[in-house]
Structures are given as structure tokens and as C-alpha cells.
Amino acid sequence: MSESIFAERIVQNLLDTDFYKLTMMQAVLHNYPNAEVEWEFRCRSSEDLTPYLAEIRYQIERLSELSITADQLAFLERIPFIKPDFIRFLSLFRFNLRYVHTGIEDGQLSIRLRGPWLHVILFEVPLLAIVSEVRNRYRYREVLLEQAAERLYQKLDWLRAEASEDELAGFQLADFGTRRRFSYRVQEQAVHILKRDFPGRFVGTSNVHLAREFDLKPIGTMAHEWLMAHQQLGPRLIDSQIAALDCWVREYRGQLGIALTDCITMDAFLADFDLYFAKLFDGLRHDSGDPLEWAEKAIAHYEKLGIDPLSKTLVFSDGLDLPKSLRLYRALSGRIHVSFGVGTNLTCDIPGVEPMNIVIKMIACNGQPVAKISDTPGKTQCRDENFVSYLKHVFRVTQ
């Protein structure tokens, strides 16, 4: 009999999250321990999720039972930039449910987080994984693990047939599939298959628990929230990206050197990404807009600053699959190093299954609005239209 694709308890340990949540959490502990934030869930489709509210609440309540184990702490201690005081903080950390508010608002599922940034930062990824898996339990009860494995092997066979040996030797891929996975067991199976059978270079996973389980490198640096929060953390708005990057440099001293570029837009980011930052950071991550146009802007920027693009890396993570990744690899080969973070296409691509398009984004910091504009207008998220207009005015965004 086939193993069930679903587990009764969806999130079973504290490290079943994306690595960049921990790297940002450490930076928040050291720099902004008193910052207050608000987050909001959004389903970008018209799907009605309200029938699942009771089960979602039950799974959220079970998060409060989790604590980090000695073995998990030992794994984190081996990462050179994870500091002893942060390890001690994690040893005491528990999910505090008073910061989570669920319900139905305007006929739609509502999830809000309000509280200290340090204590709500880890909720985002498990909440998204819970919503996704609860919904999939109801809609796709008959799906088997073998179906997910078969689909993934078809993709690996395609890549093996399509790419040359030389291309495969340099083709770097990481799993970024935690937040919108079909289920935990599908992601676990996918990472196991990729480690064992990926024909290119499987460099790791964003999921800290799975990195530990399969002896892989945990992958991730910063998310949009890091740059967004700095819009209300003290500096002038025009200096917010500079402040976010500078704080990151002081925290990690050259480690974790991939910067995210589309909190405002790529053009606004590059205006702040001067020679100092361009030398200090190892590269950039793409998460919206046309990836090739973005890459050309990045390469031109490095060249303008007198930096060899081949000393830098571009990480792509926006809605990728293997064919898109291979096209980008071929287009940029020999010009700049590239790596690909593939998410939903690895962990929720099963025949007959419609993946969810859900996010939880920061909407306020210290009682004031924050926003992400991005290089794809549909990805803008902020409840305050006046603040979005002001942000665009300050950064001279014309879209």
C-alpha cells in the first residue's frame, strides 16, 4: 500500500521553514528587537478558502507545541555566521498564538499577524504551508506520492536529454518549494530525488529541516520584508534600501551575499547599489519582471563599476521550471554565474492539481505602512495607496 501523501500534523518541527527566515531573524534580534510589524495573507486567485478555516486554525494551534531540539541547535551551531546568542534565543523560542488572527473578512479567508517582528517572523512559511496542505487534503484526496515522483522524474529525464554534459556540469539548482508545496511529504520526496538523481548540480534547499535531514546546504539570504521594514525603521525613505543593505553587511561581514533587488524596482535598487555594495555582495536575486532584461541591467551595472561580472552570481527564483532555467543558463553562460531556485514546480506540480498562489506580506512596521512595488505590477502589496504613490514619487518609479 502506498504511503499517505499527507501527514496528520502538517508542520512537525521548528526548522520546517525557509533558511532566510532564520538569517533575517538573527539580524532582527541584533538590530531591531523592539520593532513591531503587521502581516497580511492574500490569495491571488478567486478560490474560496473559507471552508478550511477550522482545520487551518487547528494546525496553527499546534505550532505552539513546537520547540527546537538539541540536535537541531547543534546543526545550526555548525553554520559559521549563526551566533551563540541567537542559538540561545532559539532554544527558548516558542510560537506565540496571540500574534495570529484568523477569520473570514469580506467573504474570504483572513490571516493577520501583529506583534514584535522578532516573534512573528517565523510564522510566515509554516502558515503558507498549512493553508496549502489543508486545501490540498480536501481537493485532492486521491493523489499518490508516486504520481509526484513520476512527474519529477519526467522533468529530470527531459533535462538529461536536452542539456549537454558541459551544460549539466554548470547547471545549479536549489529547492525553494516549502511555502506552496502540495504537502510536506511531497517536498521531502522531491529533495531526496533531487539529491540522488538530479543530472546537474543540486546545491541545496531553502528548507532548513530538509537540509539537515539530507545533509545539504541550507540556501537563502534575505526576503522582501528586510527591505520593506527599513522604510519605517528610522532612515529617510529615500535611504531605506541603503540602510537595509548596510545593516546586512554589518551583520554578516561578507557572508550571505546575495541581495534581493525588486522591493521597489531593479532600477531603483541599482541607483543605491554603488561600488561599495557591488564589491561586498556576491550577487543579486531576481524575483519579478523579465529575467533576461533584469540580467542585462545587472551585467551592465557591474561593468559600469569596473567589476568583472564573472566574479558575481545571479540567482533566479521567480516562477521557474527547468525549461525556463535552462534557457536563462544558455543565454547568460560565459557572461556571469547563475543559479536557480525552483519552488512550486518541484513541490506542487502533479497532474490534475492546481497549485495555490498565496502570499503573506508585511504591510506595516512600527505602525506605519510599508510596501513592495516590484518589477511586476501585479505583485505590489500595500493597503495604503497614498503610501505607494509617495514611495513611487520618492524613488522616481513611473510604472
UniProtKB/Swiss-Prot annotation:
Molecular function via GO: nicotinate phosphoribosyltransferase activity
Primary enzyme class: ligase
A Pfam family it matches: NAPRTase
Reaction equation(s) it catalyzes: nicotinate + 5-phospho-alpha-D-ribose 1-diphosphate + ATP + H2O = nicotinate beta-D-ribonucleotide + ADP + phosphate + diphosphate
GO biological process, one term: NAD biosynthetic process via the salvage pathway
Keyword match Metal-binding: no
Domain of life (superkingdom): Bacteria
Keyword vocabulary terms for this entry: Ligase, Phosphoprotein, Pyridine nucleotide biosynthesis
Posttranslational modification: Transiently phosphorylated on a His residue during the reaction cycle. Phosphorylation strongly increases the affinity for substrates and increases the rate of nicotinate D-ribonucleotide production. Dephosphorylation regenerates the low-affinity form of the enzyme, leading to product release.
Similarity comment: Belongs to the NAPRTase family.
Function comment: Catalyzes the synthesis of beta-nicotinate D-ribonucleotide from nicotinate and 5-phospho-D-ribose 1-phosphate at the expense of ATP.
Protein name: Nicotinate phosphoribosyltransferase
Organism: Ectopseudomonas mendocina (strain ymp)
